[in-house]
């Protein structure tokens, strides 16, 4: 069964590769794209559902009314609405780009064999998930992925470097290149998370004990905490999403950040595990590879068309931004963003 699941995950990757090769650039006019973005902002601006994450004290203090939308097309056009300048911590969205760094350095199999590419069926910070897969470490098919905390901490540990600073330079580097500007850590969030990350420390110790982490697990947890504390605004996140939509090339700066051949595998993991327990529901509704963060950010990728991001801190029970899900769904529907939806030929 585990091998079947792995084959299915790579089948999703193959399908995504085909989409990347054939999808046209967004067909709507610039005015229509901006209209779709503005309409979503107006419709959901006053939505009061959800609440800020509070298990990290700094996140509970973020303005719950913060709401910004940005969309960046693969030809570099930028559309925005609301607050696109205020930074929040990137949180779990960083997992995508650290995973991309590992895949860029070591190939797709590095993640598939060490961590896995399957949904765990457990919470994103579950220790039970680690216990459930420890017996299959090294078999090539662990039931884990790099977008839940255990897999993400392992992924961070796989970034190569002689020192912690050297590893960090690579991690922040791929985030900078994807966003198209120099990003920095929000020190208040980093301190808050460092003071309250006992569960992640336990996860790191277990992952080391069971062979998922082969370096200093305390360093891996610290670097993971630091990457989750990177400050980003909605435009940064949309540009990062658009870099993946554009087969690894930042459409604003023109820099190739990720090998195009490796992007489909990254999108496949986002498609199956990007929104925690609600990943299947999200993919069923939108078809978009996506990743959320408990800081209130959400990115989604329409391969070959655009990347979109929303920042809105109040979360639902699964840990995903309520406004962001609604806004991205509405905009994607208006622009035909679902990569699985084809127009029948007459």
Residue ranges of predicted features:
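Penicillin-binding protein/beta-lactamase superfamily catalytic region
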Residues: 165, 194-197, 202-266, 316-321
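Bacterial N-terminal signal peptides that target proteins for export
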Residues: 1-13
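Active-site SXXK
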Residues: 75-76, 88-112, 240, 308
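A short, well-structured edge-of-sheet supersecondary motif
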Residues: 45-81, 297-300
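Active-site-adjacent helix/loop patches that line small-molecule binding or acyl-intermediate pockets
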Residues: 29-33, 39-42, 47-49, 102-227
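Structured C-terminal helix/loop/strand segments within mature extracytoplasmic catalytic/sensor domains
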Residues: 246-346
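Bacterial N-terminal signal peptides
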Residues: 11-21
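Sec/Tat signal peptide C-region and signal peptidase I cleavage site
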Residues: 22-27
